[in-house]
UniProtKB/Swiss-Prot annotation:
The keyword Lyase does not apply. It comes from Parasynechococcus marenigrum (strain WH8102). This is Photosystem II protein D1 1. The chain crosses the membrane at residues 29-46, 118-133, 142-156, 197-218, 274-288. One of its GO terms (biological process) is photosynthetic electron transport in photosystem II.
């Protein structure tokens, strides 16, 4: 009898925990994905803060020339970063227990892998949690689809690009100036500005900003008057009210006359789908572009493609980018013994004109 009661008590405790995890009445929804998300994001955040403040220099290039990224080694908020793991580690999984000592783990940039892997698992779980909450509330699943764009971008720079280049030392550093350094080196090595997928991403981000500003200003300019001149117009809206808070016909008429009729949406649902889809698709393409350039399928090369009648080069924007890229690549590779091959290449001397006969 006692055993039966203990089993029922244990079962009821587990059932109560399951109900709490999946309850939509909590102030913050946890969900089963949240059970994974919370510890991984906490681990990533704690390790990032400690490493950003106090991590010792990291031998990022694997040539015994450590690079300092933390605040106590002289950096500030702009220049500081969690430096990627060493090129000597490559793509090896490098948890603390794989190092001979904690000092070795820090010297080889172990905190970077800890932060990035926990962060990626955390944002994947956050995306799953968005779907899970939508499912519980009977909503459509497009919120997590929209969130997949920044998730894809993070996966591209932290996971796919290092895989393609053969080392986590090529991943994006976790800092402001480190991000800009990553962008400059990426342009130098892959000519990303001449890649059509990057162009689509620029159109997605800038276009999304433009459309967001246009939509917000149109709605704000066509609000239905509910207040006096001495009151804030925001008091004219009550949360959950059934009436439209702005006149979509007036907004449609204004914009249709400003541009042309069919440039303006007359359907609120299709309008908001467009506002969501435009930047999401653009960022998807950028992530796809970074993922393909990770394997050196680079941007278009139009260098020295225009010549005059006497065969002299007429420099174009492509040539300007190419010269800038060469300069950035020289600055990136600071050591003569690690000089960029496309800059150090000279005319080769053949060792043998034909293969020797065998036998």
């Amino acid at each position: 009898m006692t055993t039966t009661l203990q089993q029922r008590s244990g079962a009821s405790s587990w059932q109560a925990f399951c109900e709490w995890v999946t309850s939509t009445n909590n102030r913050l929804y946890v969900g089963w994905f949240g059970v994974l998300m919370i510890p991984t994001l906490l681990a990533a955040t704690i390790c990032f803060v400690i490493a950003f403040v106090a991590a010792p220099p990291v031998d990022i290039d694997g040539i015994r020339e450590p690079v300092a990224g933390s605040l106590i080694y002289g950096n500030n908020i702009i220049s500081g970063a969690v430096v990627p793991s060493s090129n000597a580690i490559g793509l090896h999984f490098y948890p603390i227990w794989e190092a001979a000592s904690l000092d070795e783990w820090l010297y080889n940039g172990g905190p970077f892998q800890l932060v990035v892997f926990h962060f990626l698992i955390g944002i994947y779980a956050y995306m799953g949690r968005e779907w899970e909450l939508s499912y519980r509330l009977g909503m459509r699943p497009w919120i997590c689809v929209a969130y997949s764009a920044p998730v894809a971008a993070a996966s591209a720079v932290f996971l796919v690009y290092p895989f393609g280049q053969g080392s986590f030392s090529d991943a994006m550093p976790l800092g402001i100036s480190g991000t800009f350094n990553y962008m400059l080196v990426f342009q130098a090595e892959h000519n990303i500005l001449m890649h059509p997928f990057h162009m689509l991403g620029v159109a997605g981000v800038f276009g999304g900003s433009l459309f967001s500003a246009m939509h917000g200003s149109l709605v704000t300019s066509s609000l239905v008057r509910e207040t006096t001149e001495t009151e804030s117009q925001n008091y004219g809206y009550k949360f959950g009210q059934e009436e439209e808070t702005y006149n979509i016909v007036a907004a449609h008429g204004y914009f249709g006359r400003l541009i042309f009729q069919y440039a303006s949406f007359n359907n609120s649902r299709s309008l908001h789908f467009f506002l969501a889809a435009w930047p999401v698709v653009g960022i998807w393409f950028t992530a796809l572009g970074v993922s393909t350039m990770a394997f050196n399928l680079n941007g278009f090369n139009f260098n020295q493609s225009i010549l005059d009648g006497q065969g002299r080069v007429l420099n174009t924007w492509a040539d300007v980018l190419n010269r800038a890229g060469l300069g950035m690549e020289v600055m990136h590779e600071r050591n003569a013994h690690n000089f960029p091959l496309d800059l150090a290449a000279a005319e080769s001397t053949p060792v043998a004109l034909q293969a020797p006969a065998i036998g």
